[in-house]
């Protein structure tokens, strides 16, 4: 399938992540987020102002799609068709947790802090 996904921001706004999103940038909670047709990169936002409350975003991949997401800690998540990932814009100190529905491949950046994936009532 092709690279396509839908990003839902914590305020409910949706952004379609496809070839029309190439080169686009989002301002989220004072952070600059890079978008292209295959990857959404939050790691460039690392080191900028950290907010006090966690802000969650969600990427959903429709049937026939796939998409790669780079979390703010540098972890790469390759989401398959009919899958979604809910994740914080920035992780809390010492703890990295995301919620997965469906199927994904994680390339976890080794930071010395645990990385937890919650899926269907289980934590991995």
Model-predicted regions and their roles:
Residues 1-124:
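Short acidic/polar, Gly/Pro-enriched loop/turn segments located at secondary-structure boundaries
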């Amino acid at each position: 399938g092709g690279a396509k996904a839908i990003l839902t921001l914590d305020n409910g706004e949706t952004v379609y992540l496809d070839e029309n999103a190439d080169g686009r940038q989002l301002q989220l909670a004072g952070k600059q987020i890079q978008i292209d047709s295959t990857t959404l990169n939050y790691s460039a936002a690392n080191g900028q102002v950290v907010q006090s409350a966690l802000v969650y975003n969600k990427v959903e991949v429709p049937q026939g799609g796939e998409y790669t997401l780079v979390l703010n800690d540098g972890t790469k998540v390759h989401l398959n068709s009919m899958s979604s990932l809910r994740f914080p814009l920035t992780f809390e100190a010492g703890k990295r947790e995301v919620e997965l529905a469906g199927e994904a491949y994680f390339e976890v950046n080794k930071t010395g802090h645990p990385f937890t994936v919650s899926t269907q009532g289980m934590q991995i």
